[in-house]
């Protein structure tokens, strides 16, 4: 009932505010929620908007579209290459952020995939690489720039991950794997294909657990950057285009929010202060994650998963998790 009420009856506030002087980065912003969130931020006066995209051509199409509707100056929006399926691309992009941008006030890690079948990217099933490993690698790599932004400009930046309420739609059977083997079990092809419909929810659950881990180890009172995650609800977007079931498309047709309305949740989450640190944002307010997340078993699983993820991230870029 909560999902139906949220989708059909919850009114989300139209974004307001003044982002003059702010630099904002949004990944996965050539289409969908990321593009519409970028449009809102530019409309509200953002001084610099970085569209981080896999396809530069599509990114430039998005740039021209946003410029056409907002009438912003032609130097506000920049299009940068980022392929979340490649650790090398993530590191090169983050290096540009650190060296070329004077400040980063808001970072919306919106890029994500929901593949229709098993395939790999780097050393994981593709949705685990894109939605989880590369997302937290990116967070760790840009955190020094966001911390310096806080110190230099006396502000509190925000790093927001686009998650989903489907994080509660899985029992996460791989949690019973031996210590140090949860992510490896998630990546196992035979295991994944048996519960394929759970794979995207599992990736979203791992995002929620990761955000909570960072915040628990780095409380807002001692950490100058707010890190949260946001559930935009079911929206009309490119995500899910690989889903073949007619049931999914019928549900989307009748219940999905427009892309613009869904994007309001991203803009809201990115503008929140320390009260949202470590929180799961939903319907433009602090929400409640799935019961498993806050259970004793959920906390134990969170700690185990985070320990594994830290080792994986530090193997990609030695010492990178010390940036948190």
Curated annotation (Swiss-Prot):
Can you tell me which residues bind NADP(+)? Answer: 33, 58, 83, 110, 200, 204
Instruction: Report the EC code(s) recorded for this entry.
Output: 1.1.1.-
Keywords for this protein? NADP, Oxidoreductase
InterPro entries per UniProt:
NAD(P)-bd_dom_sf, SDR_fam
Q: Does the keyword NADP apply?
A: yes
- Catalytic site residues? 163, 200, 204
User: Pathway it acts in?
Assistant: Secondary metabolite biosynthesis
Give the top-rank taxon of the lineage listed in the UniProt record for this protein.
Eukaryota
Q: Does NADP appear among the keywords? A: yes
Select a single GO molecular function from the record's annotations and give it. Answer: oxidoreductase activity
First-tier enzyme category under EC = oxidoreductase
Describe the task this protein carries out: Short chain dehydrogenase; part of the gene cluster that mediates the biosynthesis of the dimeric xanthones cryptosporioptides. The pathway begins with the synthesis of atrochrysone thioester by the polyketide synthase dmx-nrPKS. The atrochrysone carboxyl ACP thioesterase dmxR1 then breaks the thioester bond and releases the atrochrysone carboxylic acid from dmx-nrPKS. Atrochrysone carboxylic acid is decarboxylated by the decarboxylase dmxR15, and oxidized by the anthrone oxygenase dmxR16 to yield emodin. Emodin is then reduced to emodin hydroquinone by the oxidoreductase dmxR7.
Q: What does the similarity note say?
A: Belongs to the short-chain dehydrogenases/reductases (SDR) family.
- UniProt protein name: Short chain dehydrogenase/reductase dmxR8
What is the originating organism of this protein? Answer: Cryptosporiopsis sp. (strain 8999)
- Gene name in the database record: dmxR8
